[in-house]
Amino acid sequence: MARKYFGTDGVRGRVGELPITPEFVMRLGYAAGVTLVAREHLPAGERPAILIGKDTRVSGYMLEAALQAGFAAAGVDVLLAGPIPTPAVAYLTRALRLQAGVVISASHNPFYDNGIKFFSAGGAKLPDAVEAEIEERIGQPMGCAESARLGRARRIGDAAGRYIEFCKSSFPNELDLRGLRIALDCAHGAAYHIAPNVFHELGAEVISVGVDPNGLNINDGVGATRPENLRQAVLSHGADLGIALDGDGDRLIMVDRQGEIYDGDKLLYVIASARAAEGRLDGVVGTLMSNLGFEHALERRGVAFARAKVGDRYVLEMLHERGWKIGGENSGHIICLDCHTTGDGIISALQVLAALKHREMSLSEACKDLVFYPQRLINVRLPAGFDWKADARIAQTAADAERTLGDTGRVLLRPSGTEPLLRVMVEGRDEQLVESLARGIAGAVELAVAG
């Protein structure tokens, strides 16, 4: 069944507009509670319980209350963790033996957006089929459990501390971060009170920015999607490197001491090449957006590479299908299944630092064999219901570009899973040609939209 509300990363939208309204989110909580508990087959007498975490958006208070009401009506107890990174919810759901976890966040989006995403009892994002089942229940009348079976809610005070220790446990015992000065940008998001403690407790000198959330400033000129802020912090403070997370803490971008920015492909290469050298890497999963240079660099090391659809959920699915442990996206979602069940910005940063420490290398030295092809990405806004695949002009322009590039590049057109955008990506060895072809395709899309 096709999903109406769920995108590549849960249900997301502008606050106050469907589906991110209090009424809809309450119905979503009820539908999810009924669906997820029914799939768990609890022993008789055991009460179902679900964890709710959120980022620092002001709308999180409203949506948390709405979700809580929906779960309570379904007879589900709720544990409220407060502001906490998305991967922390995945970990705590599993560690506390709960039936599911829920995150209220729109990740890297502005404060006026928000979203809801779910984790299974095992700490993994829900399969498409389960999300479709939840959607089907949303369309049915909302019920209410008997009074004696209504859900209860309580706050858990040690969520942050538990997660800090979990993150630190992913870093090798024989290593520490003493002598390292790290600039850390938490995007005024969910990791603001957690990430600085992780790196400090491992011995680093931490220069923190983006750690003063006010409900409105999440991702505003800071974080993994705005790495220039981190770059300036690294250069002005003479840091050895910089680490940027996004609003919900599952995305990672880094900066070296010279101010060069390292995206997800480069950081994944650092982790993968270190593990390949240790003989503990079977293969790497990237996405359709992963740079060809990244794929070729892995091939030179004899490392198998496969491309999943864009979205960390699809990277995770392919990792499980192939029995591999490492994968990610150039956007900074990196998954290390030998450390966590989902992508985690803090843990991914620790894996990069461990690789550099073990090999006694800097970021630039670890990436010296990695030569990226120029890649141009242009986002074109699409009106609701516009069928770009059926437009002959768009198809012809894209086909012409592919013929021009031949075996030296790629063309990719794909709709965003979270916004009304068509992403036009062109990649090749000649930067000027790549730019020209990308602009040509984007122009064809704009003309088609204009009619």
UniProtKB/Swiss-Prot annotation:
**EC number(s) for this protein?**
5.4.2.10
Describe how the cofactor binds: Binds 1 Mg(2+) ion per subunit.
On whether DNA-binding is a keyword of this UniProt record, the answer is: no
Q: Quick one: a GO biological-process term for this protein?
A: peptidoglycan biosynthetic process
The record's top EC class is: isomerase
Q: Which GO terms describe its cellular component?
A: cytosol
Which CDD domains does the protein's record reference? GlmM (cd05802)
InterPro entries in UniProt: A-D-PHexomutase_a/b/a-I, A-D-PHexomutase_a/b/a-I/II/III, A-D-PHexomutase_a/b/a-II, A-D-PHexomutase_a/b/a-III, A-D-PHexomutase_C, A-D-PHexomutase_C_sf, A-D-PHexomutase_CS, Alpha-D-phosphohexomutase_SF
- What does the similarity note say? Belongs to the phosphohexose mutase family.
User: What does it do?
Assistant: Catalyzes the conversion of glucosamine-6-phosphate to glucosamine-1-phosphate.
Name under which the protein is recorded: Phosphoglucosamine mutase
Q: State the organism named in the record.
A: Azoarcus sp. (strain BH72)
Lineage summary: Bacteria, Pseudomonadati, Pseudomonadota, Betaproteobacteria, Rhodocyclales
Q: Which gene encodes it?
A: glmM
